[in-house]
Design a protein with these regions (language model features):
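Helix-loop-helix junctions within the multi-pass membrane cores of secondary transporters/permeases
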Residues: 1, 83-146
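Transmembrane alpha-helical segments of multi-pass membrane transport proteins and ion-pumping complexes
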Residues: 1, 15-19, 44-53, 57, ...
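Membrane-lumen (extracellular) interface motif
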Residues: 1-11, 22-35, 50-70, 140-161, ...
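Transmembrane alpha-helices of multi-pass eukaryotic membrane proteins
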Residues: 2-15, 32-44, 63-76, 117-134, ...
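Transmembrane helical segments that form the transport core of multi-pass membrane transport proteins
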Residues: 44-113
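Extended hydrophobic-aromatic, low-complexity segments
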Residues: 82-86, 93-96, 101, 151-158, ...
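Marks the mature luminal ectodomains of secretory-pathway proteins
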Residues: 109, 206-226, 236-238
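C-terminal transmembrane helix-loop-helix hairpin of multi-pass membrane proteins
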Residues: 183-205, 238
Length: 238
């Protein structure tokens, strides 16, 4: 009889209803996240895949030699910085408002870019700090790459200038879009962390890869006109 009860209990736990299913289905926010939470991730993968297509088309060509090394750097730095800013704005809204209601000073969905970067407001200060980190951070990564893979690094000051400019453009666009998207998602009573960060990191990959491609192309064109080799010479052995 004990064996029968044990078997019956086992069958119930294997085939019976999950005790967590009922409460989760009844919880509206959880049900909403289950239903729509995957959409930003899937769409972000689609957006990011376009950057992968660009890389796939260019990485095997001589003028883009070394691009595969720089792509994870520019995409990773931009994605991480915009994720920090998105979480910062989201936390600010959680402190000062309720989902679905924007503070009076954030009612405008498309703010002036100057208000995003040039005011004394706390989110604007945060955006400036992150923007100021771009050039020093990329210079450090650039130097490390040069030490490790020097023969694949374009030996041109012009490339360094364009690379840093592309990084600034990428992060500037992403930080502004973070401000816009957080306001839009908050107005729709959605969690900005879950719905904005995937989109913005996907856009960061696409922007970073596209701008990096332009950097290599411009560097190759300028050095071709000057009749110079576009890459540094391999270090001679002992």
């Amino acid at each position: 009889q004990r064996q029968s009860i044990s078997d019956t209990t086992g069958v119930y736990w294997l085939h019976g209803p999950d005790p967590c299913v009922g409460p989760r289905c009844q919880a509206e926010p959880t049900h909403h996240e289950d239903k729509f939470g995957w959409f930003p991730i899937i769409l972000a993968m689609v957006i990011s895949s376009f950057g992968g297509l660009i890389l796939n088309k260019t990485v095997s060509k001589q003028q883009y030699q070394g691009m595969a090394i720089f792509t994870p750097i520019i995409c990773g730095v931009g994605g991480n910085l915009v994720a920090i800013q998105t979480s910062r704005i989201s936390t600010y809204l959680h402190m000062w408002s309720t989902p679905g209601v924007l503070p009076l000073w954030m009612k405008q969905f498309w703010p002036n870019p100057c208000s995003t970067f040039c005011t004394s407001e706390v989110n604007s200060i945060s955006a400036r700090v992150l923007l100021f980190l771009v050039i020093p951070g990329h210079l450090i990564f650039f130097y490390i790459i040069y030490l490790v893979e020097g023969h694949l690094v374009p030996n041109s000051k012009i490339f360094v200038v364009f690379y840093l400019l592309a990084s600034l453009i990428q992060v500037t666009i992403l930080l502004y879009l973070a401000e816009v998207m957080v306001r839009l998602t908050w107005h729709q009573a959605l969690d900005p962390d879950n719905h904005c960060i995937p989109y913005l990191t996907g856009l960061g990959d696409l922007l970073g890869t596209g701008l990096l491609t332009l950097c290599f192309l411009i560097n190759w064109l300028l050095r071709s006109e000057a009749g110079l080799d576009g890459f540094s010479e391999p270090a001679s052995g002992p």
